[in-house]
Amino acid sequence: MAHQAHAYHMVDPSPWPLTGAIAALLLTSGTAVWFHFHSLTLLTLGNILLLLTMYQWWRDIIREGTFQGHHTPPVQKGLRYGMILFITSEVFFFLGFFWAFYHASLAPTPELGGCWPPAGITTLDPFEVPLLNTAVLLASGVTVTWAHHSIMEGERKQTIQALTLTILLGFYFTFLQGMEYYEAPFTIADGVYGSTFFVATGFHGLHVIIGSTFLAVCLLRQVQYHFTSEHHFGFEAAAWYWHFVDVVWLFLYVSIYWWGS
């Protein structure tokens, strides 16, 4: 390896951005094909390619940051800014869903019966499963903060316990959301209410799955002694993402489940 007289990481050529982009194309087009033609082939291929890309890209970053020492303080600063900008872009992504929901609900058209929820729609009780889901996610926010403080204080066992609990709560939330979808008295095809409900809560559910995976990787790394009290940005980024998912759910709960019902 050539000598470098600066603290910045010159990244080696990598195939993973390309394979990740192809996986994203297959996932989005595969979802459309699944909706319209009931074929899961493209969606399955996209998922397999995405999982392979995630595994190998994360593996390479761990090698560069943990074992080769490329993640110097200036590089970590850049990663922090990158994560902040990514979460900001996600805020605007969800803002679009809230905009669609409020556009439809604040001035319902005659086609909807001039009321919200639209005529013929039976809404979900906000004080049953949705309230339980809120409690589960808020509890997971507490446990991920516990894990963060444990890492900073060098409490290895407590970090593992707190991370495990957070991941289990994330999986429990996903299970409850899946049951709610299965038993819902309306579908994504039931007009603007069904589409805004399932798209907004569905994308949030997808983010919970992504966040749970992110935290699971952090748990494996913690077990392998990758994190120290000074060097643990991989976990910090996962914790920021998880808190973002928590906050989005609170807005979804208040807007769609409680006010919207």
From Swiss-Prot:
Any one GO BP annotation for this protein: mitochondrial electron transport, cytochrome c to oxygen
Membrane topology: Multi-pass membrane protein
Alphabetic keyword roster: Membrane, Mitochondrion, Mitochondrion inner membrane, Translocase, Transmembrane, Transmembrane helix
Ranges facing Mitochondrial intermembrane side: 35-40, 106-128, 184-190, 257-261
InterPro entries assigned: Cyt_c/ubiquinol_Oxase_su3, Cyt_c_oxase_su3_dom, Cyt_c_oxidase-like_su3, Cyt_c_oxidase_su3-like_sf, Cyt_c_oxidase_su3_a-hlx
Mitochondrial matrix side of membrane: 1-15, 67-72, 153-155, 224-232
Reactions listed under catalytic activity: 4 Fe(II)-[cytochrome c] + O2 + 8 H(+)(in) = 4 Fe(III)-[cytochrome c] + 2 H2O + 4 H(+)(out)
Enzyme class label: translocase
Keyword Mitochondrion: yes
Subcellular location: Mitochondrion inner membrane
Transmembrane segments: 16-34, 41-66, 73-105, 129-152, 156-183, 191-223, 233-256
GO molecular function, one term: cytochrome-c oxidase activity
EC number(s) reported in the record: 7.1.1.9
CC annotations in GO: mitochondrial inner membrane; respiratory chain complex IV
Domain of life: Eukaryota
CDD domains tied to this protein: Cyt_c_Oxidase_III
Family to which the UniProt record says this protein belongs: Belongs to the cytochrome c oxidase subunit 3 family.
Subunit structure: Component of the cytochrome c oxidase (complex IV, CIV), a multisubunit enzyme composed of 14 subunits. The complex is composed of a catalytic core of 3 subunits MT-CO1, MT-CO2 and MT-CO3, encoded in the mitochondrial DNA, and 11 supernumerary subunits COX4I, COX5A, COX5B, COX6A, COX6B, COX6C, COX7A, COX7B, COX7C, COX8 and NDUFA4, which are encoded in the nuclear genome.
Function: Component of the cytochrome c oxidase, the last enzyme in the mitochondrial electron transport chain which drives oxidative phosphorylation. The respiratory chain contains 3 multisubunit complexes succinate dehydrogenase (complex II, CII), ubiquinol-cytochrome c oxidoreductase (cytochrome b-c1 complex, complex III, CIII) and cytochrome c oxidase (complex IV, CIV), that cooperate to transfer electrons derived from NADH and succinate to molecular oxygen, creating an electrochemical gradient over the inner membrane that drives transmembrane transport and the ATP synthase.
Name of the protein in its database record: Cytochrome c oxidase subunit 3
Gene: mt-co3
